[in-house]
């Protein structure tokens, strides 16, 4: 059995996981600390046929901090971002970016420096991480990352203005693979909360699927997306109970709240070597059953291997502790009912 697994490399209470990957490398220790809120790191990890936990190593991409001079021009609204033109006190207004007003950080997902210090405002010397629309991922993070295994991401605040940390692109958000979506057949909306990664790892980036509606799932290309110490990473979502709003559910929750990092299920999505892997696992922070059922099904004409469903509080696919499917062609759907 192959199944997604959580890899925790520092004390934390959120779960980080990804899909099966094709070739093994070195192993890592897994640990959970429910009552602490530290930084989190993730890698692509799986359990092979011999029950050996493995990770896949790959070369990390190189990014540099722009040295563009600031000017007095206004924020661009055509999807491109110009360094040194937007004040750190202003949240950018470009295509794809989403303001998270309920967090109290001026719209940012998190604000951190290299020493893991945090701030409630984007200010000099800090990395200001941001959310993108469903089906998109942020493009900005520095190639130099903290040596202790934590991560930072977003735009950099310098001399009162914002600068890209990846000058290879002027788009702050990029469209992910289109091989998965969520369909909600219930009447209440369902808030799927993606982790802010690289960054705080808090589950604050919302994909809200209204009753009778659908939304894309961010399937990141693990071969080109952020890599932690040379290891591939994927997207992860905490799935709140139906009826919980983004403002109430896409937060760092508290014990017994059943929201945020205490939500009942975790969803993983990633693509590597041309194959998409989609997973569902129970959140080890929660022992409460979800108030919905969910299954992963193939879209018309798709080639999907494996089965995965969560019904009446139990998994009915490839394993009792979660399940994974691989999409060889076409796309798959997380159907909530």
UniProtKB/Swiss-Prot annotation:
Domain of life of the native organism: Eukaryota
Name used for this protein in its record: Beta-glucosidase-like protein NCA3, mitochondrial
Extent of Low complexity compositional bias: 57-67
Biased composition (Basic and acidic residues): 68-80
Locations listed in the record: Mitochondrion
Keyword Thylakoid carried by entry: no
Function: Involved in the mitochondrial expression of subunits 6 and 8 of the F0-F1 ATP synthase.
One Pfam family recorded for the sequence: SUN
Entry's family note: Belongs to the SUN family.
Keywords: Mitochondrion, Transit peptide
InterPro entries tied to this protein: Beta-Glucosidase_SUN, SUN
GO BP, one annotated term: fungal-type cell wall organization
Provenance organism: Saccharomyces cerevisiae (strain ATCC 204508 / S288c)
Keyword Mitochondrion annotated: yes
Stretches the record annotates as Disordered: 57-84
Any one of the GO CC terms: fungal-type cell wall
């Amino acid at each position: 059995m192959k199944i997604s697994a959580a890899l925790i490399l520092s004390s934390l209470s959120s779960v980080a996981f990804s899909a099966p990957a094709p070739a093994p490398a070195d192993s890592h220790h897994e640990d959970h600390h429910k009552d602490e809120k530290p930084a989190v790191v993730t890698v692509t990890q799986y359990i092979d046929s011999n029950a050996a936990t493995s990770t896949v190593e790959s070369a990390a991409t190189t990014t540099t901090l722009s040295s563009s001079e600031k000017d007095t021009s206004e924020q661009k609204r055509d999807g491109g971002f110009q360094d040194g033109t937007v004040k750190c006190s202003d949240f950018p207004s470009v295509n794809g970016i989403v303001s998270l007003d309920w967090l109290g950080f001026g719209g940012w997902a998190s604000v951190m420096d290299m020493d893991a210090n945090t701030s409630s405002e984007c200010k000099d010397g800090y990395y200001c991480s941001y959310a993108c629309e469903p089906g998109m991922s942020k493009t900005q993070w520095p190639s130099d990352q903290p040596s202790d295994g934590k991560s930072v991401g977003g735009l950099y605040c310098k001399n009162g203005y914002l600068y890209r940390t990846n000058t290879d692109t002027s788009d702050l958000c990029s469209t992910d693979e289109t091989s998965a979506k969520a369909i909600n057949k219930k009447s209440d909306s369902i808030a799927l909360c993606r982790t802010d990664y690289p960054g705080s790892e808090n589950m604050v980036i919302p994909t809200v699927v209204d009753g009778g509606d659908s939304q894309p799932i961010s399937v990141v290309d693990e071969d080109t997306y952020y890599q932690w110490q040379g290891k591939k990473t994927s997207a992860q979502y905490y799935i709140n109970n139906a009826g919980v709003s983004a403002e109430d559910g896409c937060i760092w929750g508290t014990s017994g709240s059943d929201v945020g990092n205490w939500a009942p299920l975790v969803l993983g999505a990633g693509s590597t070597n041309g194959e998409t892997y989609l997973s569902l696992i129970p959140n080890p922070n929660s022992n409460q059953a979800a108030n919905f059922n969910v299954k992963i099904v193939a879209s018309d004409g798709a080639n999907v291997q494996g089965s995965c469903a969560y019904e009446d509080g139990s998994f009915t696919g490839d394993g009792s502790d979660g399940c994974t499917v691989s999409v060889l062609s076409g796309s798959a759907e997380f159907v909530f009912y």
